[in-house]
Design a protein with these regions (language model features):
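Structured aminoacyl-transfer and RNA-binding surfaces used for tRNA recognition/handling
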Residues: 1-168
């Protein structure tokens, strides 16, 4: 299923006047925060499109991205910092507890080709933070780690979080 779509992006450059030039360019200065797809066709294997019996809208907002933009830019007044989903109130309680338990500090570094010790620590914090959130939502929805299907996926996520935890 597919159809016409639209995306909402935020221009994070100092002047905010790139006029869409950074959209879909993988630039950290332009972040997609929302998309809308007006589902009305099925994409056929021959490249054509067949109308669907029912039309609907698929839309989604990146909560963490919106929080990151608002918090990192000080409500759109300061564009000097790099926007990161992890430098927000969404992840700070998790990272504070990880700091307490591990004795290591999260410093918001980005990994390089040959990461140094702090970059490895920060990657571990981000992986564990993401996985804790995934586990929390999944378990709250009634999914338990197990040996088959989605339960096995959850088990693998848990094991990966533990593996990264051991690096701290």
């Amino acid at each position: 299923p597919c159809g016409p779509c639209s995306e909402l992006h935020v221009d994070l450059t100092a002047n905010g006047d790139t006029k869409g030039g950074l959209v879909n360019s993988d630039s950290a200065d332009c972040i997609e925060i929302w998309n809308l797809v007006f589902i009305q066709y099925n994409a056929d294997t021959d490249g054509g499109f067949s109308p669907l019996a029912a039309k609907y809208v698929d839309t989604g907002m990146g909560f963490e991205r919106v929080a990151a933009i608002i918090q990192t830019t000080n409500n759109f007044s300061d564009f000097t910092k790099t926007v990161s989903n992890y430098d927000t109130d969404v992840f700070s309680p998790i990272f504070k507890e990880l700091e307490k338990q591990s004795g290591k500090k999260y410093k918001s570094t980005l990994p390089s080709i040959e990461p140094n010790e702090q970059q490895k620590i920060d990657v571990a914090f981000r992986v564990i933070g993401d996985h804790i959130r995934t586990l929390s939502f999944s378990i709250a929805d009634g999914i338990q780690p197990g040996n088959t299907d989605r339960n096995y996926v959850l088990r693998r996520i848990l094991r990966r979080a533990v593996r990264y935890g051991r690096t701290l």
